[in-house]
Amino acid sequence: MSRSFRNGFRLLKLSQMDFERAWWDMANLFRAPRRVYRSITLRKQNINRYGREDFSFIVLFSCMIVISALLWALFYMNTPKGYVTTITFMLFVDFGAVGVIMATMYYFIAKRFLMKSNDTILSSTDYQLEWNYCFDVHCNSFFPSFVLLYVIQLFLLPVITRDNFISLFMGNTLYLVALCYYSYLTFIGYQILPFLKNTHALLLPIPMFFIMWALSLLGFNVPKHVVDVYFGKSA
């Protein structure tokens, strides 16, 4: 069996996963996200790649998503089919499929528009953009949004779905914060790569989010419509 296959199987062993590091990453994505990416820069010097060494972050994140899905189903789709449907959608669509799409999109954007044109950089294997690193960046960026929209929002729904302006403002602002923080963390993730330029362009969606948020305050309750899309009924 080749070395790459042996390494692949090693990465799938729970005993080989660094869950302590995964917890550290998750905590610092809230309080000091640049520390997470500084540690990635140091890791690059040790193992010569930017992507994570194992799947501990993804495994831990997936477990949290499953628990969150169980709670959502308990409140809004309390049937065996409802539990399976909610877990499947949140884990394999929201996290898996959307993650692959976002990572691939940013991978091609970075390769097409953000790569430095220096011939030395382009020819060096030390400065190759890794798709799995793009997926890691998405996971890092999505985690705070997950906490805001899949955990905190669930318990705030009785308040933020009421028919008054304060509830409208609170609920829509929750989504604004989640989207802006996702974009900011994504920007940090690509900013640390020495072979990319003009990474501030990745912050361009943030003004658009503010415009959409301001327009939504005219009467479009985002949390209420999201629940309706997910579960076919208003909160």
Swiss-Prot record:
Its main location: endoplasmic reticulum. Residues 1-54, 110-140, 197-201 are cytoplasmic. It is found in: Endoplasmic reticulum membrane. The keyword Membrane applies. One of its GO terms (cellular component) is Golgi membrane. It is a multi-pass membrane protein. Residues 76-88, 162-175, 223-235 are lumenal. One of its GO terms (biological process) is meiotic cell cycle. It comes from the Eukaryota. The chain crosses the membrane at residues 55-75, 89-109, 141-161, 176-196, 202-222. Keywords: Endoplasmic reticulum, Meiosis, Membrane, Transmembrane, Transmembrane helix. The keyword Transmembrane helix applies. Belongs to the unc-50 family. Has a role in meiosis. PANTHER family: PROTEIN UNC-50 HOMOLOG (PTHR12841:SF6). This is Protein GMH1 homolog. It comes from Schizosaccharomyces pombe (strain 972 / ATCC 24843) (Fission yeast). The gene is mug16.
